[in-house]
Amino acid sequence: MAAIRKKLVIVGDGACGKTCLLIVFSKDQFPEVYVPTVFENYVADIEVDGKQVELALWDTAGQEDYDRLRPLSYPDTDVILMCFSIDSPDSLENIPEKWTPEVKHFCPNVPIILVGNKKDLRNDEHTRRELAKMKQEPVKPEEGRDMANRIGAFGYMECSAKTKDGVREVFEMATRAALQARRGKKKSGCLIL
């Protein structure tokens, strides 16, 4: 039996960990150097609830320079991973300010998984010191959950691509959301207006 194909698009601020998350999931290796993404695609196979799913992973650039280019990734999306970084409260603030309006405009009715990346930095001393200088602290799990409720996300997950903690679970939840979303709808997905 042929695998079910689903398209996943990952969005979020620049440097919040989107590409690392995709690379660790699809290639099982952590890239140590940061290279801003323009557009990359990966394919990964995942089995969820006894179903074989071929997940097309569409990486996007978070930097504002790409705001006009990014919508080219959105057509026919089955699920969105909307990311912020646990060591950056500002990236969480951009979820309702920037990312939710953009995604809901181009991808109405597509399920969103809110993902807190860089979970390993929540208790990292250096990270806490740097944030304290700006009177900030790492994002708490309940703040992530509250945000997921606020934006009407399908679910909230936290992970660390560096330690691989929670990575597989993020994509399992995303795949389940993509599979459920198709039921009862002929063809939703994203449209370019």
UniProtKB/Swiss-Prot annotation:
Keywords linked to the UniProt accession: Cell cycle, Cell division, Cell membrane, Cell projection, Cytoplasm, Cytoskeleton, GTP-binding, Hydrolase, Isopeptide bond, Lipoprotein, Membrane, Methylation, Nucleotide-binding, Nucleus, Phosphoprotein, Prenylation, Proto-oncogene, Ubl conjugation
Cellular component GO terms, alphabetical: apical junction complex; axon; cell cortex; cell periphery; cleavage furrow; cytoplasmic side of plasma membrane; cytosol; dendrite
Presence of keyword Electron transport: no
Pfam families: Ras
Annotated positions of the 5-glutamyl serotonin modification: Q63
First-listed, main subcellular location of the protein, grouped into a coarse class: membrane
Listed Gene3D superfamilies: P-loop containing nucleotide triphosphate hydrolases (3.40.50.300)
Self-association and partners: Interacts with ARHGEF28. Interacts (via GTP-bound form) with RIPOR1 (via N-terminus); this interaction links RHOA to STK24 and STK26 kinases. Interacts with RIPOR2 (via active GTP- or inactive GDP-bound forms) isoform 1 and isoform 2; these interactions are direct, block the loading of GTP to RHOA and decrease upon chemokine CCL19 stimulation in primary T lymphocytes. Binds PRKCL1, ROCK1 and ROCK2. Interacts with ARHGEF2, ARHGEF3, NET1 and RTKN. Interacts with PLCE1 and AKAP13. Interacts with DIAPH1. Interacts (in the constitutively activated, GTP-bound form) with DGKQ.
Protein's recorded name: Transforming protein RhoA
Source species of the chain: Rattus norvegicus
